């Protein structure tokens, strides 16, 4: 299966009538492997900050997490594995695998739990595949 198929079929899938606003699979260096049409472009320093938070959980909490200049308040996650952010009525979930970052961005009416489920399910699958 291509990386684009993972995005199209597993991240942008319908969940209780709703979809993520955008999604992508990136390398740890920020290189886009596949993305949805409306996925924002990360700046290199944003990827650096995200990767540092995976290595040093809590690094982003004081400043927030920036994605294409949009600021997300960092909320509960799983240290070293998942970063979650909230911005207004939407948010973001980032799951780190051995080689990739699986990213989902949502807006209402999709819930944070639905976004977490979609992103983390694919991320867990990729981890089991050694990716």
Swiss-Prot record:
What does the UniProt PTM comment say about this protein?
Phosphorylated by MAP kinases.
Q: What residue intervals traverse the membrane?
A: none
The SS bond pairs are 13-115
Instruction: Identify the residue span(s) of motif Involved in PIP2 interaction.
Output: 81-97
User: What residue stretch is flagged as signal peptide?
Assistant: none
Q: Which Pfam families match?
A: Profilin
Predominant place of localization: cytoplasm
Which keywords does this Swiss-Prot/TrEMBL entry list? Actin-binding, Allergen, Cytoplasm, Cytoskeleton, Disulfide bond, Phosphoprotein
Subcellular location, record wording: Cytoplasm, Cytoskeleton
Any GO molecular function = actin monomer binding
Query: According to the UniProt entry, which residues carry Phosphothreonine?
Result: 111
Its GO CC terms are: cell cortex; cytoskeleton
Lineage top rank: taxon: Eukaryota
> Keyword Cytoplasm, does the record have it?
yes
User: Is Cytoplasm among this UniProt entry's keywords?
Assistant: yes
Miscellaneous note, as given in the UniProt record, is:
The variability of the residues taking part of IgE-binding epitopes might be responsible of the difference in cross-reactivity among olive pollen cultivars, and between distantly related pollen species, leading to a variable range of allergy reactions among atopic patients.
Subunit text: Occurs in many kinds of cells as a complex with monomeric actin in a 1:1 ratio.
Name the family the entry cites: Belongs to the profilin family.
Job description of the protein: Binds to actin and affects the structure of the cytoskeleton. At high concentrations, profilin prevents the polymerization of actin, whereas it enhances it at low concentrations.
Q: Mind telling me which PANTHER family this protein's record contains?
A: PROFILIN (PTHR11604:SF31)
| Record's protein name | Profilin-8
Q: What is the lineage of its organism?
A: Eukaryota, Viridiplantae, Streptophyta, Embryophyta, Tracheophyta
């Amino acid at each position: 299966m291509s990386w684009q198929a993972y995005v199209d079929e597993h991240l942008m899938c319908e969940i209780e009538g709703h979809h993520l606003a955008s999604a992508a699979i990136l390398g740890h260096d920020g290189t886009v492997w596949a993305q949805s049409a409306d996925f924002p472009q990360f700046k290199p320093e944003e990827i650096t900050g995200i990767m540092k938070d995976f290595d040093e959980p809590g690094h982003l909490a004081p400043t927030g997490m920036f994605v294409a200049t949009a600021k997300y308040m960092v909320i509960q996650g799983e240290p070293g594995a998942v970063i979650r952010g909230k911005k207004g009525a939407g948010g973001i979930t980032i799951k780190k695998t051995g080689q990739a970052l699986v990213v989902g961005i949502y807006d209402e009416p999709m819930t944070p739990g639905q976004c977490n489920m979609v992103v983390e399910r694919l991320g867990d699958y990729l981890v089991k595949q050694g990716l």
